[in-house]
From Swiss-Prot:
One of the primary rRNA binding proteins, it binds directly to 16S rRNA where it helps nucleate assembly of the platform of the 30S subunit by binding and bridging several RNA helices of the 16S rRNA. Forms an intersubunit bridge (bridge B4) with the 23S rRNA of the 50S subunit in the ribosome. This is Small ribosomal subunit protein uS15. Belongs to the universal ribosomal protein uS15 family. It comes from the Bacteria. Keywords: Ribonucleoprotein, Ribosomal protein, RNA-binding, rRNA-binding. The keyword NAD does not apply. Part of the 30S ribosomal subunit. Forms a bridge to the 50S subunit in the 70S ribosome, contacting the 23S rRNA. InterPro entries: Ribosomal_uS15 (IPR000589), Ribosomal_uS15_bac-type (IPR005290), uS15_NS1_RNA-bd_sf (IPR009068). The gene is rpsO. HAMAP family: Ribosomal_uS15_B. GO terms for biological process: translation. One of its GO terms (molecular function) is rRNA binding.
């Protein structure tokens, strides 16, 4: 259920500020969003996989905290990432 290396590299290239930028908030949010999509599809098939459900909830919480940080520090970047990923955010 982990991201493929090619998918991860494509996300980093799209949302990173420079080559190899894996630590910026936008990249972290985009990577978490992709993992959340994959895990959501997994849980639609395997409804009783409670350990994966717990991991999903942790990822959603982490993404929520990163979005709150980005909203607090740079609102323009926050709106860009939310619109490009199609995330509902308050």
């Amino acid at each position: 259920m982990a991201l493929d290396q090619e998918v991860k590299a494509a996300i980093i290239a799209k949302y990173g500020k420079k080559d190899g930028d894996t630590g910026s908030s936008e990249v972290q949010i985009a990577l978490l969003s992709e993992q959340i999509k994959i895990l959501t599809e997994h849980l639609k098939v395997f409804k009783k996989d409670h350990s994966s459900r717990l991991g999903l909830l942790k990822m959603v919480g982490k993404r929520k905290r990163l979005l709150a940080y980005l909203k607090r520090t740079d609102y323009a970047r926050f709106t860009d990432i939310v619109n490009s990923l199609g995330i509902r955010a308050k």
